[in-house]
C-alpha cells in the first residue's frame, strides 16, 4: 500500500508534464532517492570509506547504467546495499515510467495518454495499439533472460563463493549485464580474474547483446512464435540484427589483430583465449563496460577503435547507450544518396523519410557537440595531466553510458567527477530529450512563415 501510494504521488506530480520532462524528472528523482538509500548506515560494509558524494556518483552511474565508480561496490555495500544497487540498475535499465506502467496494467487501471507517450518516448516505440503487450514483453523478456543468465552463472560462482555469495553474485551480474550497466560485486578489477573463463564471458556477452538489441526487436521476434501465419520481421529488426553482427565481427577481428602480440592485454594467451577476450571486449565496448583487459596496456589505436564503438553504441529502445547504430546508418545512407545524386535516401527497396534523416542529423550533431564540450571540460578540470586518449576514452565512456576507464576515474577530483556525472545523465536520457525538456520550445507564428531561400556555399 505504501509503495502504491508513493507511485500515485509520482503520477500526480508528473501528470502535467511533457514526455521529455517526465523522463528527465523521473531519472532525477530515482537518483536522489537512490543516493539517500545508499547513504544509510545499515547498508554500508564494514570496510566502507564512501562519502555522500561517492554514493551520489555510484547512484548516477547505476541509474544511468554506466558502470563507473569511485568506490567499489563489494567493499562499500553489504548485502542490503547490493540489493538496492540491483534495484537501481534495473530501474535505470527499464525506466521508472515503465515500472509505473506495469503496476497500473497489473492493477487493471487505464494508463493515461501522457503515460503512454512517456513510455513510447523512453523506448522510441512508435506504435500505440499494442503498448500494453509491449510493456508486458519488456518485463517478461527482462526477467526471463536475467533468470537464465543468473542460473548459468551460478554453475561457476556457487562452487567459487558458496551458496549465499554465489547466488547473489550470479543475480547481480545477470542484472548488470542485461541492463548494460557494467557493475560487478567483485572489487575494482571488473572481470580480469575471469578473463579466459568461457562460461562467464559468453553468458555475460549474451546478456549484453540481448539488452543492447532493444525491446522493439525482441517484441517483434516474440510475435513470430505461437502464430500459424508468420508475419515478416520489421525492417528495423532486420537492420539492427545485421548492424550488430557487423560491428561485433569488425571489433573482434580488429582487437585480435592489433593486440595479438601485446603481452599487456592478450599477447600471452592461447589463440582460442585471444579470440574469446577480443569478442568479449567488443561486446562490452558497445555499451556495457565490463573489463577483461587493462586498458592502460592496450595500444592507442585499439583504444581509438573502442572510442568509435562506444560512440556508435547499441540499438534504440533498449538498455544500450551511445549515438545508436540505426542513427549512424541513416546518416550513411543519406550521405550515399547525396554522393550519387539521388533524390531520396533509399536502402533495400525502401525510402527513409526526410523527417527521420533530419532527426538523425540533429541527434548526431547534439551528441557530437556534447562529447566535445565534455572532453574540453574534463581536460580542463582533470588533475595530473592525463593522456589525451585516456580523456577521450573517459568522456565517451560516460556519455555513451559504457563505464570503462583507463584507471582515470579514481584519479579525478570532484569537479571533474561532477562533469562525468552530468555526461552520464545526459547520455542516459539522451541529449535531444534533455534539450527538449529544458527548452520546451513552442513555435510561434513567425516559424510558420516561409522566407526567401538562403544561398549558402558548403563543402
Report the location of each language-model feature.
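Membrane-proximal intracellular helices of multi-pass ion channels
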Residues: 1-459
